[in-house]
């Protein structure tokens, strides 16, 4: 399967958190006899994926409007919409804040990690223009929802699923409203 269009590249964007998670496992849980070069490669890969979140959304926002859908394309669009929401939730609500705050001992350090993850989420939405501020506020609200649900249920997966559903529904509503 060849990648031929901008849409194909954007469809690959949701794979970033999966690859990020795999490289992080290698980086955080090094095997005893693994060469240091592999650990360095895992760390570079991890940070490259995090930084790519600031590039790929810009590229995806520049795609032409999907409306009206070509025949049979509506379902694929909404699947992509869901997968993009899932990848952003895993990355910006679970991975980045918890990675930044993992060794933080002070409230100030934890707050800086939380604020940085919200800023990165807003920056990833900068092609939306003035809606970037709204995206930052929504990112903060989704992080609060994530933390509360994780505390209530004890499950990071359940918290991610809830935030993904809210995020995907909002994106679907916003895109449909903009198309009118």
Swiss-Prot record:
Topological relation to the membrane, as annotated: Multi-pass membrane protein
Question: Looking at the keywords, is Cell membrane present?
Answer: yes
Q: Name one GO molecular function term.
A: endopeptidase activity
Family matches, as Pfam families: Rce1-like
- InterPro entries named among the record's database cross-references: Rce1/LyrA-like_dom (IPR003675)
Ordered alphabetically, the record's keywords are:
Cell membrane, Membrane, Transmembrane, Transmembrane helix
What are its GO cellular component terms?
plasma membrane
A biological-process GO annotation? CAAX-box protein maturation
Q: Give TM segment ranges.
A: 37-59, 128-147
Instruction: State where the protein is found.
Output: Cell membrane
Identification of the protein by name? Uncharacterized protein TP_0335
Record organism: Treponema pallidum (strain Nichols)
């Amino acid at each position: 399967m060849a990648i031929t269009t901008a849409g194909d590249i954007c469809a690959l964007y949701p794979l970033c958190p999966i690859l990020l998670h795999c490289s992080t496992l290698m980086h955080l849980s090094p095997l005893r006899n693994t060469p240091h070069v592999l650990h360095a490669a895992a760390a570079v890969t991890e940070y490259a994926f995090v930084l790519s979140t600031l590039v790929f959304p810009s590229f995806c926002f520049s795609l032409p409007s999907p409306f009206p859908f070509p025949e049979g394309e509506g379902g694929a669009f909404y699947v992509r919409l869901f997968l993009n929401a899932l990848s952003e939730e895993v990355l910006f609500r679970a991975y980045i804040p918890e990675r930044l705050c993992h060794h933080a001992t002070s409230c100030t350090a934890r707050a800086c990690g939380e604020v940085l993850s919200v800023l990165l989420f807003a920056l990833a939405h900068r092609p939306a223009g003035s809606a970037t501020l709204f995206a930052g506020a929504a990112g903060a609200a989704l992080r609060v929802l994530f933390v509360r649900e994780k505390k209530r249920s004890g499950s990071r997966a359940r918290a991610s699923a809830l935030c993904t559903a809210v995020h995907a529904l909002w994106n679907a509503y916003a895109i449909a409203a903009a198309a009118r």
